[in-house]
Amino acid sequence: MTARGTRKNYQRLWRWGTMLLGMLMICSAAENLWVTVYYGVPVWKEATTTLFCASDARAYATEVHNVWATHACVPTDPNPQEVVLGNVTENFDMWKNNMVEQMQEDIISLWDQSLKPCVKLTPLCVTLDCTDVNTTSSSLRNATNTTSSSWETMEKGELKNCSFNTTTSIRDKMQEQYALFYKLDVLPIDKNDTKFRLIHCNTSTITQACPKISFEPIPMHYCTPAGFAILKCNDKKFNGTGPCTNVSTVQCTHGIKPVVSTQLLLNGSLAEEEVIIRSSNFTNNAKIIIVQLNKSVEINCTRPNNNTRNRISIGPGRAFHTTKQIIGDIRQAHCNLSRATWEKTLEQIATKLRKQFRNKTIAFDRSSGGDPEIVMHSFNCGGEFFYCNTSQLFNSTWNDTTRANSTEVTITLPCRIKQIVNMWQEVGKAMYAPPISGQIRCSSKITGLLLTRDGGKNTTNGIEIFRPAGGDMRDNWRSELYKYKVVKIEPLGVAPTKARRRVVQREKRAVGMLGAMFLGFLGAAGSTMGARSMTLTVQARQLLSGIVQQQNNLLRAIEAQQHLLQLTVWGIKQLQARVLAVERYLKDQQLLGIWGCSGKLICTTTVPWNASWSNKSLNEIWDNMTWMQWEREIDNYTHLIYTLIEESQNQQEKNEQELLELDKWAGLWSWFSITNWLWYIRIFIIIVGGLVGLRIVFAVLSIVNRVRQGYSPLSFQTRLPTQRGPDRPEGIEEEGGERDRDRSGRLVDGFLALIWDDLRSLCLFSYHRLRDLILIVARIVELLGRRGWEVLKYWWNLLQYWSQELKNSVISLLNATAIAVAEGTDRVIEIVQRAYRAFLNIPRRIRQGLERALL
């Protein structure tokens, strides 16, 4: 009965307790999320940075690129790392690639650097008296072979023998000199057949290339400084723009040969499967088309003339190198390539173009005109600049049923040689390439083409005409750099978690850790944010990978140039790369220090996560998203989150400072430190001054009050007798009355005595009041403890009651279940028994039925 009464009395309390428990469960389900900082996450963003070069060049090589690479490029990595990024899709755009612009500037700087110490040919800007060199010879082919060997005979007037006056080693004396010039290098004066001048003489400063320099390029690798990476697209059919699903990361590109050529791309990389055509816009005929072959076409070029070189003095300390004479027959330079291989290549290109341009007939034609560098295939062969006529290569029509056929096995391209070259099509810059002695032979591989498409009326006839193009060397570099892009690594990431920074403590500065290669940590880019395979420790260590090794390599390259007392463009870039790598690391460490996360890979904060930044749940974030996807999700709020973390850390440091200021009172012995004595004296003076001031104020108030009542002021220590009541008469003269028992405070004289008396009264008053307060608090605590004990006993009894009720309910439920199961079992057994008996009685029932039928 007592338990039932208790349940009846506290039924309302039970209802409120249930509601409170439900609210707690709801609140726990909607748990707050907090911003957490992660250091070492595999996240990157597109960037432009200073690239430096790596090369296998040797110091004893005299070739211009080799010398340049030896002094300014770092050695290539013997074991380059390429990390495949699984489950990563990245957008590439070869037409908006800053690496191309950098390479263009670098190659131009290379040529300028190589020509700086060379001789200027300004004294040769004089009138030249020229006559045509006789190019006929008795040793030419006979008449039966004139058709096939017509290219061997140099055209009349192609080579000219010129005389001119030049300054000798003595400035005021002139001397007549003779030299051989090619027709492309001189211009007639006033349409005169005998008076000429050097080309570009009136518009450019002509610089003679140094005699020991050749122009054969060697492979160069473009590398990024630490903190950056190069993403590489490995899709075999990648067209240069759009998403790429097979992505890897490297520190340096493959070896790229800086071959300066037009129309045909030489000694480049090949497509892996089939021919690929690339253009920024195929519908715009002004845009160039870059063709990448899947199989190279070998082209062999020759200058058969056996030239001799002559040195002509054009002033003190300056010499002009020219062709003195040609020994033997004067024959034309030429290039040979296989017709079958070339036609097969053109067929593959035409097939690709036909698919791109709606099955129209594809026609190839010669260049439409322009500078010699564009009209002809220009390139450098053994130090001489060849200009070859490619009309035989681009003179065919292709459709589904017909193709060009020819019985000739070899295609021979007639070539002209030019010594004065207008480099990079820039006004004011021209170079004179000294003649090379002896015969010249070179072999190259055609790996690509540069084409343009005609616009206008021809397209309406179902024919698309394509012509060779070139001239902009950016397209040459773009054909090799199409699959690369530079990104900067963003190792700092923020994400919501349930953890909140609880303890205010001072963080210690951590020394930076070194790793092997910083590219390794990007291998986890395709993993989810919560994947166990992604260890932040390894990734954070690898963030500095390459910095130390890279700095050492760059320093060696820079030190190699110190004896020259000058830095090439690469030396400057390497210095920039060194500074940039350190700045990137220090910037991240500075942010971690500002946020109070120095030396931590995972750092909790007190900044609550705002659902407006991202309303995804923790499971959606950590189990389904990569760090790259998450970074794109919150990219617009990253700066705001960083600001909030900084403000939170500033507030925490203020709280920490206030907390540390209380540490000096932690030890009792510090109270007696001599450094605190002046503070104690100051406090004592303030207290005494306050007491004296209060005493004076109260005294003045007392005087004012008494003056208002009509009394004159008395001494400050005079105590007036206490007024007796009406039932207490005064004493009489005969001493018959009560002895005077009026109370009065003791009288003191002097200022110090007055202060001491007031201070004693204040201390006694404080003691009594403090004692009363302690007694009151003790009484309250006693009452609360007693009441709390009673409440605990009540809850314990209530818990025991409900436990017993729950136990009884469970027992009743089990009993009811057992009874129901037992009854069900009995029913089943009874049904089975009846069925069994019915089965056994079947013969009896049959017999009884037969008996009734017979009766």
UniProtKB/Swiss-Prot annotation:
Lipid-conjugated positions (S-palmitoyl cysteine): C763
Gene that specifies this protein: env
Region (MPER): 661-682
Changes after translation: Highly glycosylated by host. The high number of glycan on the protein is reffered to as 'glycan shield' because it contributes to hide protein sequence from adaptive immune system.
Keyword Coiled coil among record annotations: yes
Motif Di-leucine internalization motif, residue range(s) on this chain: 854-855
Region forming the signal peptide: 1-31
Extracellular topological domain residue ranges: 32-683
Organism: Human immunodeficiency virus type 1 group M subtype B (isolate OYI)
Stretches for region V4: 388-415
Regions crossing the membrane: 684-704
Miscellaneous comment as given in the Swiss-Prot or TrEMBL entry: Inhibitors targeting HIV-1 viral envelope proteins are used as antiretroviral drugs. Attachment of virions to the cell surface via non-specific interactions and CD4 binding can be blocked by inhibitors that include cyanovirin-N, cyclotriazadisulfonamide analogs, PRO 2000, TNX 355 and PRO 542. In addition, BMS 806 can block CD4-induced conformational changes. Env interactions with the coreceptor molecules can be targeted by CCR5 antagonists including SCH-D, maraviroc (UK 427857) and aplaviroc (GW 873140), and the CXCR4 antagonist AMD 070. HIV-1 lineages are divided in three main groups, M (for Major), O (for Outlier), and N (for New, or Non-M, Non-O). The vast majority of strains found worldwide belong to the group M. Group O seems to be endemic to and largely confined to Cameroon and neighboring countries in West Central Africa, where these viruses represent a small minority of HIV-1 strains. The group N is represented by a limited number of isolates from Cameroonian persons. The group M is further subdivided in 9 clades or subtypes (A to D, F to H, J and K).
Lineage: Viruses, Riboviria, Pararnavirae, Artverviricota, Revtraviricetes
Record protein name field: Envelope glycoprotein gp160
